Design a protein with these regions (language model features):
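N-terminal secretory signal peptides that target proteins for export/translocation
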Residues: 1-6
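Bacterial N-terminal signal peptides
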Residues: 9-23
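Low-complexity, acidic/polar, glycine-enriched regions of mature
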Residues: 24-198
């Protein structure tokens, strides 16, 4: 088959264009990194309120990351937590009280973790504030409800640190109340994390 000079030039142009794009695709594919679940930490802080709150405790809850990915090239992030794996870490309570708090947290009155075992976050928009700082908007699925959340993130020494404020009622969870409402859990909880990418 005889190739004209014009056709040959077009083929050469196409080859050059594809060659120019290949490094971009390669960089894009390589920018996605898995979250190191062994070295990453996600903590939920739950606070008390009410008339006799001085006699109650704030709660610290560990939420092990099951899996997740970070992609600075595409400005995306997502992770999954198994709700059944959440653990109450409160150091100032007895083992018996800690077990009771955990049973309440995982049970049908709060997280209902057997019915809703997955907690998932997926970013929808990432805005760069300055070098190593971002505001991340995304969808959080918790207790079978998906709601938009905003997360402030900072990268330092290879670690991504951040926090967000959530309202339990936004996810269909009624804050725990005891002693006729004289001691109760605040609707607002704070989520803190430190992620390390592999």
């Amino acid at each position: 088959m005889r190739i004209t000079a014009k056709a040959g030039a077009m083929m050469l142009f196409c080859l050059l264009a594809v060659s120019a794009l290949l490094p971009v695709w390669a960089a894009d594919a390589g920018s996605q990194k898995a979250i190191d679940t062994e070295r990453s930490v996600l903590t939920v802080r739950v606070y008390k309120t009410g008339l006799f709150s001085a006699f109650a405790h704030d709660h610290e809850i560990g939420a092990p990351i099951q899996k997740g990915v970070l992609d600075e090239g595409k400005s995306t992030a997502e992770f999954v937590v198994d709700a059944r794996a959440l653990r109450v870490l409160d150091p100032d309570v007895s083992d018996k009280d800690r077990a009771e708090i955990q049973a309440t947290m995982l049970g049908p009155k709060v997280l209902d973790s057997e019915k809703f075992p997955e907690i998932r976050f997926h970013s929808t928009e990432v805005n760069r504030i300055s070098e190593g700082k971002w505001t991340v908007h995304g969808d959080l699925t918790l207790h079978g409800q998906t709601r938009p959340v905003k997360v402030d993130v900072e990268r330092k020494n290879g670690r991504y640190r951040g926090s967000a404020q959530l309202l339990q009622k936004d996810f269909g969870i009624t804050p725990v109340t005891i002693a006729g409402g004289t001691v109760k859990v605040k609707d607002e909880v704070r989520v803190e994390f430190e992620f390390v990418a592999r």
